[in-house]
Every structure is written in C-alpha cells, then in structure tokens.
Design a protein with these regions (language model features):
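Short secondary-structure capping/turn segments at boundaries of alpha-helices and beta-strands
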Residues: 31-36, 48-49, 67-69
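Surface-exposed interaction/gating patches
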Residues: 148-234
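Peripheral, non-catalytic segments flanking oxidoreductase cores
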Residues: 59, 64-72, 131-132, 141
Length: 235
C-alpha cells in the first residue's frame, strides 16, 4: 500500500481577493501564510491561509478569479471543507458567526462529531467540527480569534460522487486511508494524520457540479518523500 499522511492542502476558487483575505483572516482568524501568484495564470494571486507555522494539513488556498461565474457544487466535486476547533469553543463560534450574519446551521452530529455549517462570501460550504483532538493543540495567539478558540487546522473534506466505490478504492489502496464507516449515503475514510485526516464521500445522484467561484479547485495529499510520491503517481 502506498501510504500518505492525509490532506496536504485544499485549493478553492474565490472572487474578490480583498474580500477573501478579510473573511479568512478577520472572521475565521487564519494566518495569511503566503501571497504569491498562480503559476498557470500569473495575473492572479494565490492566497494561502493556515495555522501559525503553515503546517501541512492546515492550509486552505485560493485562486481569486473575479471575472468567473459562481460555481454550482454538486456531483463530481468536493462540496465542503471542514476545520477543527476545540470542543469548548462551540458557543464562541455560534455567537461569532451569528453576530456577523453568516447564518450558521444549528449544531448537528455526524459520525459522533458536533458540527456547524456556513458559507464564505463566495458560497464555499464550510464546517467547523468541534474536535476533541484539537483540545490539546495550541491555537495561533496573534490572530483575530482568541487562541483558545482558534481554528487548529483542516479536519477534512466532503466529496460528492455518483458511486463512492472507485474514489473509495483509491483512498484505501493508494492513499493510505482506512474505511471508517457509513452514515446513510455518506462514507467516511480516515488517515492517522494530525491534521486533514478525514475524507467523506456522499453518494449523489444529482447533476454534475460546475466549477466557479465558491467551489473547490483541488485537494492535494501528503507523501512521505519524493520516492513515495513517484510510487503513488505510477498507480
């Protein structure tokens, strides 16, 4: 089996770069780890947000393409990005998101996790997972959110597929994830990574999604070294 160590980063598509920056740094309290350009489109920024050290598994990046139409997340796409926050931060985040008129969902449970959902300014579906493993991880103490409540990293991502099987096989056979259970039409896969350890696939029989603002561009996975990366690439 070709092992990876979970999610390395997730890249999504945004609209206005200033609006994106203000939301992820001032509302969610993430650190702007790096600002560079899209190497395939040098006229476009590439914005990286993460924890204090910019560790793999904490980084969400964006290509802000203002001219692009709004996307329609659906089958064949990643349809949600989840962050880990401490369990004691639940009321803080509910109050914060409501105060900022972000209309968070009521707290709901999935695979035993307590979660709230909301959207960023471009409509990207986000979740905060009140994760016991985050309770023992320090938060960034220089951000807009107090350290005790700060986002710790990426928890995982949700994919929508017509048939979860082929993607599930890839996760298990080539990327080192283990099948962790089923809840209705949702299937969970888990790695042993500290951050970015969860991929969930929902069986979705609706229309194919359309890329655009507010959708995920790609998910990158970690490999232990160059040799392991080459092995995975050959499979």
């Amino acid at each position: 089996m070709n092992q990876t160590n979970g999610i390395h980063h997730i890249t999504a598509i945004a609209g206005n770069p200033q609006q994106n920056y203000e939301f992820y740094t001032q509302v969610l309290g993430l650190r702007l780890v790096k600002k560079t350009v899209n190497f395939d489109d040098p006229a476009t920024y590439h914005l990286y947000y993460g924890n204090e050290a910019g560790e793999a598994g904490t980084v969400l990046t964006f290509f802000p393409w203002e001219h692009l139409h709004k996307g329609k997340p659906d089958r064949g796409q990643a349809v949600a990005v989840s962050f880990s926050v401490p369990t004691a931060s639940k009321q803080f985040w509910i109050d914060r998101l409501r105060k900022l008129n972000l209309n968070p969902t009521e707290v709901f449970k999935r695979f035993g996790d307590e979660i709230i959902g909301f959207q960023d300014p471009d409509g990207l579906h986000l979740e905060l997972v009140f994760d016991p493993l985050s309770d023992n991880i320090n938060g960034w103490n220089a951000g807009a959110v107090p350290a005790q409540h700060a986002i710790r990293g990426i928890y995982g991502a949700t994919l929508a597929e017509k048939n979860y099987g082929p993607t599930g096989n890839l996760l298990e056979q080539d990327l080192g994830f283990d099948y962790a259970g089923q809840l209705d039409n949702r299937h969970r896969y888990q790695s042993d990574a500290r951050f970015g350890s969860i991929i969930e696939i929902i069986d979705q029989f609706g229309p194919s999604g359309q890329s655009g603002k507010g959708t995920v561009h790609h998910i990158a996975f970690r490999a232990a070294d160059d040799r392991r990366q080459e092995e995975i690439g050959r499979n």
